[in-house]
Regions:
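Alpha/beta-hydrolase fold nucleophile elbow
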Residues: 58-70
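Short beta-strand immediately N-terminal to the catalytic nucleophile in serine-hydrolase-like folds
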Residues: 66-68, 93, 140
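Short beta-strand/loop motif that positions the catalytic acidic residue
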Residues: 132-134, 138-141, 145
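Membrane-embedded segments
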Residues: 1-52, 62
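Hydrolase active-site cap/lid region
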Residues: 75-129, 135, 179
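Catalytic histidine-centered segment of alpha/beta-hydrolase-like enzymes
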Residues: 172-184
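Acidic catalytic loop of the alpha/beta-hydrolase fold
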Residues: 144-148, 174-176
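Short alpha-helix in the alpha/beta-hydrolase fold that links the catalytic acid
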Residues: 126, 135, 149-158
Length: 197
């Protein structure tokens, strides 16, 4: 299944090879997990995983660098808001301004509006949450992003705090920026993770 933990493995395996501890998990109802996938549960799923691993020998005493893509970036922002003191950096790829806005822009005027009306949004939207991020922050924009459209990207970037870096990556699709073994952005991400405080 696309967008589950096994699909994301190649995008972060290079970090583990560089001795960066990596925690991957499937949200409820995705991959091998049971339950129902819901937007309002994604950050709670991340929190449950964090509670399970934070006292392990490999992790104990370390602060997190959150890395989320698409809906995972939305969840990473909400996780950050309830764990600020445990996070030292945030990296977001293909992040949108609002959940309903993403649906409307992806599916067009009529269908997008109908689908957006049925969506149960979370209490805080990414464009609101991002204004509360105080740690170092990177936003990764694939040049051929087929997940987040330009309107949502611009609305989100308008809300960015001043410490945010934007990495525009020409020629790459959503979920492909870090999957390429020859990607120079991999080194940039590794440098960010190792040097952020």
């Amino acid at each position: 299944a696309q967008f589950n933990m096994s699909y994301s493995m190649q995008q972060v395996a290079f970090l583990a090879l560089e001795s960066v501890p990596v925690i991957l998990f499937d949200y409820q109802g995705v991959g091998e997990t049971e339950g129902e996938a819901r937007l309002d549960n994604l950050d709670k799923d991340a929190g449950a995983v964090w509670e399970c691993v934070k006292n392990s020998d490999l992790i104990k005493g370390r602060k997190l660098v959150l890395f989320g893509q698409g809906v995972g970036a939305d969840a990473a922002l909400r996780f950050y808001l309830s764990h600020k003191d445990q996070v030292k950096g945030v990296v977001l790829e293909s992040i949108y301004a609002s959940q309903k806005g993403l649906i409307q822009e992806r599916h067009g005027f009529i269908l997008g509006d109908l689908l957006a009306r049925t969506l149960k949004e979370t209490d805080i939207q990414p464009a609101q949450a991002i204004t509360l991020v105080t740690c170092p922050l990177v936003v990764v924009n694939p040049g051929k992003d087929n997940f987040v459209r330009k309107g949502q990207r611009k609305l989100f970037e308008f809300s960015l705090p001043k410490q945010a870096e934007i990495w525009n990556v020409p020629g790459k699709n959503y979920l492909c920026v870090f999957a390429d073994n020859n990607s120079p952005v991999r080194e940039k991400l590794l440098d960010f993770i190792k040097n952020v405080d």
